[in-house]
């Protein structure tokens, strides 16, 4: 069984949105005044690219909300999640912006702030309140603020509740300003990204890729911008990417887990060999500790294949694999003292 440990937050949604908005017409602007991208400008160019994708979707000076969970029939990138719904906005800090994070009670909601150098100038926030961002505090003229809010993807009523929560996110700013970025040369940017991804493929630990300027390693941060722009520290979200040994689609697996040391929540999402959710008649794609069925002892048993009448059942196919997402993991997970149990062939 292969297991990879990574940390992540907004890379997937960033890639998703860029894929949705990209087109030959906007992919490369006019050749006049192209600004070449080198190793020392790559992070800024990459941030500007993603910021522009959010702006193009209507998220400039205000928040653009993803109103539904990941659609099974329209997955634009691999290994998307159906645990949370996203809200995001890009702001010109020529004038300060104040953002109100609503009180969501026991429901998980995070607010992440990323500047143009892909640093997190303030910690990921989970508490309700008002937060004022200035250019002095953030460090760059533009900033991206992203929310992710827990949602039960199989419950239309819960999705409506999340939509109402999204509408409670408020923005106050004297002037929205303008969005003005260099005309980065996409060809040199693509070449630089490809080269950095070759180096990034040798990384076994992403813990120094994302965070504040003081927390990251400069080289790891550069590589992180290439393979997963917008990732946040492992202390906020840690993923385990697992491929079972006998993932032939015929051998059922199971795992039992109890008392997972997270302050947020955990989930398991199952993908096919291409990394996508594979449509099934059970509408079963992921399990989490909020909506999953507990055993009498408080543990959860996840069934991969086998009897579809079992609780917490996920259908499997040839080449299947899964990701465990751990939101706000406690120190014993980060230290490796507690490990999420792996799925084993069912007895």
Task: Identify what each model region corresponds to.
Residues 1-4:
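Positively charged n-region of N-terminal signal peptides that target proteins for export
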Residues 9-19:
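Bacterial N-terminal signal peptides
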Residues 19-27:
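Signal peptide processing junction and immediate N-terminal pro/mature segment
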Residues 27-347:
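A compositional/structural signature for long, glycine/proline-rich flexible linkers
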């Amino acid at each position: 069984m292969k297991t990879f440990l990574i940390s992540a937050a907004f890379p997937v949604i960033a890639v998703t949105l860029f894929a949705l908005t990209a087109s030959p017409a906007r992919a490369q602007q006019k050749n006049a005044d192209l600004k070449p991208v080198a190793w020392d400008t790559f992070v800024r160019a990459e941030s500007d690219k993603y910021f522009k994708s959010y702006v193009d979707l209507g998220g400039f000076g205000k928040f653009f909300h993803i109103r539904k969970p990941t659609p099974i029939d329209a997955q634009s990138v691999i290994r998307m999640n159906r645990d949370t719904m996203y809200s995001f906005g890009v702001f010109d800090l020529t004038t300060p912006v104040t953002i109100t994070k609503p009180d969501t009670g026991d429901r998980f909601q995070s607010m992440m702030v990323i500047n143009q150098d892909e640093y997190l100038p303030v910690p990921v926030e989970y508490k309700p309140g008002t937060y004022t961002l200035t250019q002095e505090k953030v460090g760059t003229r533009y900033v991206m603020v992203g929310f992710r809010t827990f949602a039960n993807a199989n419950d239309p009523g819960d999705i409506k509740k999340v939509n109402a929560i999204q509408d409670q996110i408020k923005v106050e700013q004297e002037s929205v300003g303008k969005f003005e970025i260099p005309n980065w040369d996409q060809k040199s940017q693509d070449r630089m990204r490809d080269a950095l991804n070759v180096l990034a493929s040798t990384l076994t630990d992403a813990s120094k890729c994302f965070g504040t300027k003081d927390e990251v390693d400069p080289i790891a941060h550069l590589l992180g911008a290439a393979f997963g722009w917008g990732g946040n520290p492992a202390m906020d979200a840690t993923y385990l990417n697992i491929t079972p040994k006998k993932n032939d689609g015929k051998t059922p697996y199971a795992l039992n887990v109890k008392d997972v040391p997270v302050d947020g929540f955990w989930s398991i999402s199952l993908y096919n060999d291409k990394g996508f959710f594979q449509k099934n008649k059970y509408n079963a794609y992921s399990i989490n500790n909020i909506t999953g069925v507990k055993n009498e002892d408080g543990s959860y048993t996840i069934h991969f294949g086998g009897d579809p009448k079992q609780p917490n059942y996920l259908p499997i196919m040839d080449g299947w694999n899964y990701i465990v997402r751990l939101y706000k993991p406690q120190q014993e997970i980060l230290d490796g003292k507690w490990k999420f149990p792996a799925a084993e062939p069912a007895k």
